[in-house]
Amino acid sequence: MPSVNVRDMDSFEAALKMFKKQCEREGILSEIKKREHYEKPSVKRKKKVLAARKKLAKKMKMLSR
């Protein structure tokens, strides 16, 4: 859980910017988007296999250059 310590001289905008950066670093928004809708285990497996194939194809393409 991100938390921001606001000093006396910090403005609200600066504190909000720091909070957004911490949320982005921890991957909170991507996690929320991922959990927005239920995904069946079979669909998760298919996506995982597809991502692995795509990664392998990209690696092979880079090696062939």
Curated annotation (Swiss-Prot):
Keyword Ribosomal protein: yes
MF term (GO), any: structural constituent of ribosome
Domain of life: Bacteria
Gene Ontology biological process terms from the UniProt entry: translation
Pfam families linked to this entry: Ribosomal_S21 (PF01165)
InterPro entries, per the entry: Ribosomal_bS21, Ribosomal_bS21_sf
Alphabetic keyword roster: Ribonucleoprotein, Ribosomal protein
One Gene Ontology cellular component: ribonucleoprotein complex
NCBIfam families: S21p
Family to which the UniProt record says this protein belongs: Belongs to the bacterial ribosomal protein bS21 family.
This protein's name: Small ribosomal subunit protein bS21
Gene: rpsU
